[in-house]
Amino acid sequence: MKKLIALLLTLVMVLSFAACAKTEAPAEDTTEATEANTTETTTEVVGDPVAPAMSHEEYMAAEMDSEIVIETYVQATQSWWDNKITVYCQSPDGAYFLYELACSEEDAAKMVPGTKIRVTGFKGEWAGEVEVMDGTFEFVEGDTCIAEATDVTELLGTEELIAHQNEFVSFTGMSVIDIEYKNGEPGDDIYVTLAKNGATYSFCVERYLTGPETEVYTTVGTLKRGDTVDVEGFLYWYEGVNTHITSVTVTGAAMSHADYIAAADNTEVTLITNVQAWQSWWDNKITLYCQTEEGACFIYEAACSEEVANSLGNGSTILVTGYKSTWEGEAEIVDATFVVIPGEFYVPEAFDATSLLGTDEMIAHQNEIALFTGMTVKAIEYKNGEPGDDIYVTLTKDGADYNFCVERYLTAPDSEVYTTVGSLQAGDTVDVLCFLYWYQEMNPHIFHIMPVA
């Protein structure tokens, strides 16, 4: 499927050049001139023939440091300085990055998008970016062409993406993770981290391409973590994909907890939240208990690599995207992906929910870390009749019964809480810390229990 997508994208790129205007003059009948000058032309000294321009395929196949000749179209330039200019170029069969091309200030002014140029230089590579170095050029009169952006969102994380290196591309539905100015304040490059499907990617606002006075520079500077954006730019490479952004459109933002709760089932949701605990990782999935200062959420079987699962800590900040769902009264996020935001943590204190037992107010705290004090043990029952699976715990308070659970994927049989609960007797008094899970009614998942003497 990915190979099919890559093939279709290549076709789209070629078609995007089909509309390029040609301004070549019509051919003249030169038969007479040829016949009349046959003798003369055969006696002339013929100079070195003009080297034919390479195709993009031939350029990519050329050895590093070898001389190359290409004809291509200017798409954008970085700032001219010291008789040099760096140019982003593209042709119907591929794109090029021309680093510090020799160029007068007068010619730099003519380097407008669509202009055709013939370039002679040397093929080089720097940090994965294939480029033309030590180049010279001449303008080629005739056709002009401006590339349309090719959407390569589906190629993120694949080996096919690099085949589009330096092309003018677009990415849709990207989530903002981080915005960082190169020197800590506006004026220099902006390093942008965006996420898609649980993976992060580096982008850059290159100040010599789109400087501090441009709209894109200003817009990127105002982005907030969790914003959803569509991006266009040149598919530059720096130790991995590092697109140079030329435009950004904000299409959404991370939800508040109130907006998440109000969202209808099957609605796509994006939240910034903090992981407080998780069930056992398996089959590249993990179930998370999360809470911020605003409220809590339960993320069911989010896509997650083992490496990411092992990196989670109590309070880790994540950006999660998935779909709102309700199962047996439990609001949860399903079919989710998430990205860990490094260096930020939040762990709330448990709130004492004892006084809310039996009230309608309890559900407003669904999935939060809660404390229940002075609860009396009524019954302990193993799910399958013996230790190893979940433990169903019935606790009473003021004559009413409430169902709790020791969820084995949260607190396994070898954990202290599992052992402690298994040793309880009817009539024991306990204080309980739990996540306020719901199953047809309040059914908290216990993660700590304290017998009261």
Regions found by a protein language model. Name each.
Residues I5, V14, V45-V46:
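Short hydrophobic transmembrane-like helices used for membrane targeting/insertion
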Residues P26-P49:
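Intrinsically disordered, low-complexity serine/threonine-rich repeat tracts
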